[in-house]
Amino acid sequence: MDSSRKYKRCGFGAALFVANIFFSLLSLHCISGAHGHQQRMKESVMGSEPPVCATKCRNCKPCLPYLFDIRGAHDDDDDSEPYYPVKWICRCRDRVFEP
């Protein structure tokens, strides 16, 4: 009779152990999924911040980021268009450099 109690306690402990491992793995999966979501969000806004231009203009100073509007490159120059292409460049005096 004592041995059956021992096995029941052992079975209960094993079940708790398995449940603990299951929930630990589940929480790790959720955390890594959240990190992946943050990474995708970061990638989706890439390019919206000005570049660091300090070393991009060779020896020319001051080298500053400039948002270049390339609307004129397209045939329809309609100002009512909600989207028009822009590009960040580094500019120093009258020279332009790629960031």
UniProtKB/Swiss-Prot annotation:
PANTHER family registered for this protein in UniProt: EPIDERMAL PATTERNING FACTOR-LIKE PROTEIN 4 (PTHR33109), EPIDERMAL PATTERNING FACTOR-LIKE PROTEIN 8 (PTHR33109:SF60)
Protein name as catalogued: EPIDERMAL PATTERNING FACTOR-like protein 8
Annotated localization: Secreted
Keyword Disulfide bond applies: yes
Cross-referenced InterPro entries: EPFL
Cystine connections: 53-90, 57-63, 60-92
Highest classification ranks of the organism: Eukaryota, Viridiplantae, Streptophyta, Embryophyta, Tracheophyta
Keyword Disulfide bond appears in the UniProt entry: yes
Role, per record: Controls stomatal patterning.
GO BP terms in the entry: guard cell differentiation; stomatal complex development
Keywords: Developmental protein, Disulfide bond, Secreted, Signal
Principal subcellular localization: secreted
UniProt similarity note: Belongs to the plant cysteine rich small secretory peptide family. Epidermal patterning factor subfamily.
Signal peptide: 1-35
Stored Pfam families: EPF
A single GO cellular-component term on record: extracellular region
